[in-house]
């Protein structure tokens, strides 16, 4: 039973070493050049970079090794791993801050600085290596100060970003399904079944996880677990009732069970993950005592954690919830007479911005951004002729915001890895996040997520003048 439960809570196996070596050798060469031609490829490369940096940090901390100058960078008691983790993530974080500053204000790929975002991978990797060397020159005392006053607040902000993404995605998913159902085309019945099945499945999964938590983690002496599971169950019921309340739906017709089901299943999973992340000093975590799955679950869970952080980081900057775009007003592409006197690139860029605004409002599908039929003329320089480039006339996301969020992610990883782990949990690999601190982070994060979703549901009823649901979401 422990093995079955540990799989969704933890994630990846003994293939980490071989996969890690292969990724390192190709990251800055062929893969970078082939993927870097599209905005998605670029974001994936940065995510892989973050993942590899996290894995190196984890292995260094587990082995308690320093990459450079161990005689100077380790403490008198032989502690090396803590400072190695902070140095590696400090170096990568500084790289992203430098890129954020350099790329400030870039809104078009015609800007020469845009090339730094989507190419020049060798140069960025060399700069990263230089920053690593520099980070090992800085004394250990600096990282103690930095971790307390920069890494911890940055990690908290990153967690909040992830929660906002989840709530936004819940609304986006439900809205997509409902729009297809209301279109009454040949696929509307499929989308209706998909919406009903998805909602039912997520509520069922929430109930199953709640029962499992009460059975496995809520013994008589486990007051923390009992409280966390009970509060989560109460909040699930509250969000369910709110989402179908007649007054709420009158103010927000798009509110429903679909959004609340996704929030409920995610928050219930977070709570269950918190149970499995706590130490077993009070005999409340049977997964730790399952020796047959212990090392596998540690490796699997650590890799899954890093992948989840990389995904959150990559998705955040391209998400409309963080763009601050005003989505009010009609969309009009204009004609060639209105664009007369403008160059081909300028004309195409104006049209692209109009289509991009329509996509953000939901008036057009995202595929419209990849349709080149709206291009009036090709670039005289041929710079926009690359069919794999989805940023031919404008950036798809805020480059500066993208790198700021990556900086926040590096600091959260540093804190996540270096929070104290009890000695009985230490083996060949240190478990990532097996502390009461991380358990409470997950539990409180679930509560905040419920609060964020509850506000998005209640706010239109409280302040109807500030919400226009024809253009909301």
Swiss-Prot record:
UniProt cross-references to Pfam families, sorted A to Z: Serinc
Note the InterPro entries from the entry: TDE1/TMS
Q: Write out the topological domains of type Vacuolar.
A: 30-38, 105-118, 168-194, 247-295, 422-435
Cytoplasmic compartment: which residues?
Answer: 1-6, 62-81, 139-144, 218-228, 319-398, 459-473
What membrane topology does the annotation report for this chain?
Multi-pass membrane protein
Q: What coarse category fits the chief subcellular location reported for this protein?
A: membrane
Q: List the disulfide bonds.
A: none
What is one GO cellular-component annotation here? membrane raft
Q: Which domain of life is it from?
A: Eukaryota
Localization terms from the record? Membrane
**Keyword terms:** Membrane, Transmembrane, Transmembrane helix
Transmembrane stretches, start-end? 7-29, 39-61, 82-104, 119-138, 145-167, 195-217, 229-246, 296-318, 399-421, 436-458
Q: Which family does it belong to?
A: Belongs to the TDE1 family.
The name of this protein is Membrane protein TMS1
Where does this protein come from, organism-wise?
Saccharomyces cerevisiae (strain ATCC 204508 / S288c) (Baker's yeast)
């Amino acid at each position: 039973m422990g093995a079955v439960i540990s799989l969704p809570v933890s994630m990846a196996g003994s293939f980490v070493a071989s996969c890690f070596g292969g990724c390192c050798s190709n990251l800055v060469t062929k893969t970078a050049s082939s993927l870097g031609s599209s905005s998605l490829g670029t974001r994936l490369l940065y995510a892989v970079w973050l993942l590899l940096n996290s894995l190196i940090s984890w292995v260094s901390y587990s082995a308690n090794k320093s990459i450079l100058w161990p005689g100077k960078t380790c403490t008198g008691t032989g502690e090396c791993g803590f400072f190695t983790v902070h140095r590696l993530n400090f170096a990568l974080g500084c790289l992203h801050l430098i890129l954020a500053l350099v790329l400030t204000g870039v809104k078009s790929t015609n800007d020469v600085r845009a090339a730094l975002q989507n190419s020049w991978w060798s140069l960025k990797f060399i700069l990263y290596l230089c920053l690593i060397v520099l980070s090992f020159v800085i004394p250990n005392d600096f990282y103690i100060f930095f971790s307390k006053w920069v890494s911890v607040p940055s990690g908290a902000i990153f967690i909040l970003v992830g929660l906002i993404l989840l709530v936004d995605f819940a609304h986006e998913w439900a809205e997509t399904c409902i729009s297809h159902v209301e279109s009454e085309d040949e696929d509307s019945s499929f989308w209706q079944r998909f919406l009903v099945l998805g909602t039912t499945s997520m509520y069922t999964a929430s109930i199953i996880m709640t029962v499992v938590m009460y059975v496995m983690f809520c013994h008589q002496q486990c007051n923390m677990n009992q409280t966390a599971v009970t509060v989560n169950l109460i909040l699930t019921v509250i969000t369910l009732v709110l989402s179908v309340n007649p007054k709420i739906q009158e103010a927000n017709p798009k509110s429903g069970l679909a959004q609340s089901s996704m929030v409920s299943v995610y928050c219930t999973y977070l709570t269950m993950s918190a149970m499995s992340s706590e130490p077993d000093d009070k005999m409340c975590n049977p997964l730790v005592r399952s020796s047959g799955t212990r090392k596998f679950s540690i490796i699997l869970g650590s890799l899954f954690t890093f992948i989840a952080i990389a995904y959150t980081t990559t998705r955040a900057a391209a998400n409309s919830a963080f763009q601050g775009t005003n989505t009010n007003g009609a969309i009009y592409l204009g004609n060639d007479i209105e664009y007369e006197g403008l160059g081909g690139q300028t004309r195409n860029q104006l049209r692209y911005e109009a289509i991009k605004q329509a996509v953000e409002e939901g008036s057009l599908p995202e595929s419209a951004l990849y349709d080149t039929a709206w291009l009036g003329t090709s670039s005289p320089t041929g710079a926009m002729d690359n069919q794999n480039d989805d940023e031919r006339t404008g950036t798809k996301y805020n480059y500066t915001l993208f790198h700021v969020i990556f900086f926040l992610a590096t600091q959260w990883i540093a804190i996540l890895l270096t929070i104290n782990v009890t000695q009985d949990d230490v083996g060949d690999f240190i478990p990532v996040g097996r502390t009461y601190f991380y358990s409470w982070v997950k539990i409180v994060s679930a509560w905040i997520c419920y609060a964020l979703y509850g506000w998005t549901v209640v706010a239109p009823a409280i302040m109807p003048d500030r919400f226009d649901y024809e253009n909301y979401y």
